[in-house]
């Protein structure tokens, strides 16, 4: 489970942020 919170719609963007790291 991710420590950060995000909307289901933002799920894809959140994953992209993780890859960006």
Curated annotation (Swiss-Prot):
Keywords of the record, alphabetical order, are: Adaptive immunity, Blood coagulation, Coiled coil, Disulfide bond, Hemostasis, Immunity, Innate immunity, Pyrrolidone carboxylic acid, Secreted, Sulfation
What subcellular locations does the record give?
Secreted
Q: Does the UniProt entry include the keyword Cytoplasm?
A: no
This entry carries the following GO cellular component terms, namely: extracellular region
| Pyrrolidone carboxylic acid PTM sites in chain numbering | 1
According to the UniProt entry, which residues carry Sulfotyrosine? 6
Q: Where is the composition biased (Acidic residues)?
A: 1-11
One GO BP on record is: adaptive immune response
Write out the PTM section of this UniProt entry. Conversion of fibrinogen to fibrin is triggered by thrombin, which cleaves fibrinopeptides A and B from alpha and beta chains, and thus exposes the N-terminal polymerization sites responsible for the formation of the soft clot.
Bias (Basic and acidic residues):
12-21
Disordered: region residues: 1-21
Which comment does the entry carry about domains?
A long coiled coil structure formed by 3 polypeptide chains connects the central nodule to the C-terminal domains (distal nodules). The long C-terminal ends of the alpha chains fold back, contributing a fourth strand to the coiled coil structure.
Quaternary structure and interacting proteins, as annotated? Heterohexamer; disulfide linked. Contains 2 sets of 3 non-identical chains (alpha, beta and gamma). The 2 heterotrimers are in head to head conformation with the N-termini in a small central domain.
Described by its record, this protein's role is as follows: Cleaved by the protease thrombin to yield monomers which, together with fibrinogen alpha (FGA) and fibrinogen gamma (FGG), polymerize to form an insoluble fibrin matrix. Fibrin has a major function in hemostasis as one of the primary components of blood clots. In addition, functions during the early stages of wound repair to stabilize the lesion and guide cell migration during re-epithelialization. Was originally thought to be essential for platelet aggregation, based on in vitro studies using anticoagulated blood.
Q: In its UniProt entry, what is this protein called?
A: Fibrinogen beta chain
What is the originating organism of this protein? Antilocapra americana
